[in-house]
């Protein structure tokens, strides 16, 4: 296996940083990972999925969205769903020029990263999609963050999430989709997962984790997710 740090540009020119994990095989199928709103490319889920994909003969690319990690920009100023879509489209375009990976590329996104994957998949040719805790729209999250005694993470998300978005019109265009969600997620309620699954076209699958939270902190849920994601991405 080979690990390569890369710099590339979003489609609007913003400089971004990423890491490509290549297995020991030529022209590997590739999965691109999109991290959550307050995370970066070093998130545990992305690192674990990169290693697991390599063991299955797939390449994995994880990158920092603008304003996060080693990429340029300021989180509070530059974050929006559309801006992060431009980041992902830049990654797709950059990697499509490499001879050592093969498309169409699979997508994985966690939380806001899942929303980015859904939005891009509705406008670009991609392979299998896996989301975890992806929101359909931002308005209910912003309203919930204004209530007293909400998790600090939710308040922070509301500060940086950017303009409101609603992906409901795009959902019927999606297919080849695995939706994973914790049933007790206090940040993105499980109703979002049910809405995504109901609207998407076949093939599709939903995995709801009883008692599951937003960061997927239960090791049993992590194992369940990894097995389901690998099956979906390699089918």
Which residue ranges define each predicted feature?
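Conserved alpha/beta-hydrolase
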Residues: 50-72
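The serine-hydrolase catalytic nucleophile loop
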Residues: 38-50, 191
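Acidic catalytic loop of the alpha/beta-hydrolase fold
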Residues: 184-188, 215
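Hydrolase active-site cap/lid region
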Residues: 119-161
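Catalytic nucleophile-loop/oxyanion-hole region of alpha/beta-hydrolase
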Residues: 41, 69-101
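N-terminal cap/lid segment of alpha/beta-hydrolase-fold proteins
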Residues: 1-25
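Catalytic histidine-centered segment of alpha/beta-hydrolase-like enzymes
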Residues: 212-224
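Short beta-strand/loop motif that positions the catalytic acidic residue
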Residues: 173-174, 179-181, 185
């Amino acid at each position: 296996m080979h690990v390569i740090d890369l710099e590339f540009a979003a489609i609007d020119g913003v400089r971004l940083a990423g890491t490509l994990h290549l297995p020991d095989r030529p022209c590997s199928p590739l999965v691109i990972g999109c991290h959550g709103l307050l995370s970066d490319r070093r998130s545990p889920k992305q690192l674990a999925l990169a290693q697991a994909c390599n063991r299955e003969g797939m390449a994995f690319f994880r990158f920092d969205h603008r304003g996060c990690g080693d990429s340029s920009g300021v989180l509070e100023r530059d974050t929006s769903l559309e801006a992060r879509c431009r980041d992902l489209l830049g990654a797709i375009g950059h990697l499509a020029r490499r001879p050592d990976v093969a498309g169409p590329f699979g997508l994985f996104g966690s939380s806001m990263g899942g929303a980015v994957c859904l939005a891009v998949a509705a406008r670009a040719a991609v392979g299998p999609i896996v989301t975890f805790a992806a929101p359909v729209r931002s308005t209910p999250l912003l309203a919930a963050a204004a209530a007293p005694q909400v998790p600090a993470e939710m308040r922070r998300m509301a500060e940086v999430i950017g303009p409101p978005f609603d992906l409901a019109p795009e959902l019927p265009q999606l297919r080849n989709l695995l939706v994973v969600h914790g049933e007790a997620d206090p940040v993105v309620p499980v109703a979002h997962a049910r809405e995504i699954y109901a609207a998407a076209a076949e093939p599709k699958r939903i995995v709801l984790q009883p008692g599951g939270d937003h960061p997927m902190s239960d090791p049993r849920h992590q194992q369940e997710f990894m097995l389901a994601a690998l099956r979906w991405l390699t089918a």
